[in-house]
Every structure is written in C-alpha cells, then in structure tokens.
C-alpha cells in the first residue's frame, strides 16, 4: 500500500512516517512524505500535483493550521488552510480513486456538555471558535467531494451518523477542472475516514508538557506558584499512539466513517500539569484558575473529552497516563541537555 502523509514534518506527521516505515503493508518503498514547499496548504494546485507525481493509494492529511489564536485573528486564512485545502485534496483524491484519512479535532464540539460523557461521532458537531469552525468546514468539504463522486464516507452497512456534516461549506469552491491529468484507479470506490483527536502532544517539543515545564521553571525562579486552568478537561493523546491507531484503521482495509481516536481517560489541564511535574520531579505548586480568567483570541472548549471509537483490532488506545510514561524519558533527556548547556 502506497501511503502519503501531508504535514510530514509536524508532530503527527513525523509519528505517522515512523510508524509507516515499520508497517508490513507499506511495502519496500515506504511512505511518501509530503511537506512544504511541495505540499503547501496555501497552494490550490498542490494536491493535484502531488497525487499526479507520486500516485499514492492512501493520503493521510495531517497538515493543518493548528494555531487556534491565529485562526481567531485571521478566520479567512483558517478557512483557506483548514477547509479549502481539504476540499482541493478530497476532490483530487476521489477523482483519482485515492483513499483519504482526514485528521480533525475535538474542537468541532463547543464543549458545553454537562453530562460528563465523551463526545461520540453520533453527536452533532457545533464548534465554539474559528479553529473548530474551519476544521468542521474541512470535514464537510471532504464528505461532499466523496459523496459527489461515488466515494464511501461510511463502512458498508454502517448506520448513518446524525452528527455527520452535510454538503455545505468549502466544497463548493472546488473546480471540476482541478483534476485534469489525474491518475485513475477505479477498481474500488475510494474511502474517506475522518479521525478526530484531542490534546495532541509528543516530540518535537512545544507541546503542553514542554510548555508546562518551562512555565514551572519560571515560576520556581520567581518563588511563585504556577497558575493552570482547572475547568478545561480533555483527553491527552500521544502522537505515536494516534499514529498507531490510524494504521490500525488502514490495516483493516475498510475504514470509511468518522472515528474518535484518543488515549483513554480524561483529565483537567491543572491535574495533567501536576502529573507532568510529579513525573519529572519538579516541585512547584499549581493553583487552579478558570478559563474565564484568561483573555485570549480563541476560547477552547471546556469539555474536550472524546469517547474513543472501537478500532478494527479491538484494542483501544492505552490510558493517557501509560502513554505519558513513555514520553517522560524524552522530556527528562531534553531537560538534562538544557541544563548542561
């Protein structure tokens, strides 16, 4: 199976490339790494060009503009990168018979749920910020493209999802002429999988654990406690684990539909921060604050918990605590190296 990964230089992209290199179904040539400048979200021709040149059987779209505050400041750019770029890619995929795995986010939900249940794919999405709106528009664009050209957006026989985006949003901007010269592989209807995840972390740096450790160091130097939000709750997800979950889908051969793939469990930002500091033996007290106390362009959903969907192997992702235990040595080495410098 020839698999291409967009955003191959990013957090999830790197994890996917590493996992695919060891996967038995990718063959001797290995995965295709699409990244800038060859694949650029701002380039309307990038999808057609990359598919025509490399002829993948599956594209995993991990590229996105994930700067949530930037999306709030520049919502038109957010739509360009997270919706129109998806529309162009989905159109190119379905016209060439290429399967598409679209990575999306918990922020398609507004987080106002009060029953302490995780969001399922059957729950109707309702974004509460421009980033979530742009990602939901991307989901809708991909579904519209696949529905419009005979692709599969559900596993055969699967019940319909009331929460699936309809035919609206950015898909209308896709030109039928965009796929001129595309390779065609019509042996089977191409599949679309939408994979939503949450609170992604892992190498290379600048994730929540790295930032909380840096903030704790500054607080300790100032002799102050660390203030962390206590009423934002979610599902921390380790990028290598998410990559393995996506490969689980691909290995099954039949993966169309909406999937929620996160490490099991839920935790507040403050308690996750405490867990990180304890694991790295950093003794700085955390004082809980509220989301309302922070002023920023984008407001994250207070309840970001996704209910994991069953993977084809039957094995869900492990609890977030076990996943973080594998990341802890990486953080420890980085901190030790920074101290020596």
Identify the residue ranges that each predicted region occupies.
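N-terminal Rossmann NAD(P)H-binding glycine-rich loop of SDR-like oxidoreductase domains
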Residues: 1-22
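Adenosine-cofactor binding site in Rossmann-like domains, unifying the SAM/SAH pocket
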Residues: 27-49
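NAD(P)H-binding glycine-rich loop region in Rossmannoid oxidoreductase-like domains
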Residues: 41-81, 92-94
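Glycine-rich NAD(P)-binding loop of the Rossmann-fold in SDR/ketoreductase-type enzymes
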Residues: 42, 73-88, 125, 129, ...
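Conserved Rossmann-fold NAD(P)-dependent oxidoreductase catalytic core, especially the SDR/UDP-sugar
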Residues: 87-130, 150-156, 171-180, 185
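NAD(P)-dependent short-chain dehydrogenase/reductase
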Residues: 143-154, 182, 186-234, 241
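Mid/C-terminal beta-alpha module of Rossmann-like enzyme folds, strongest
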Residues: 224, 245, 252-297, 331-341
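C-terminal amphipathic/interface module of NAD(P)-dependent oxidoreductases
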Residues: 282-284, 299-341
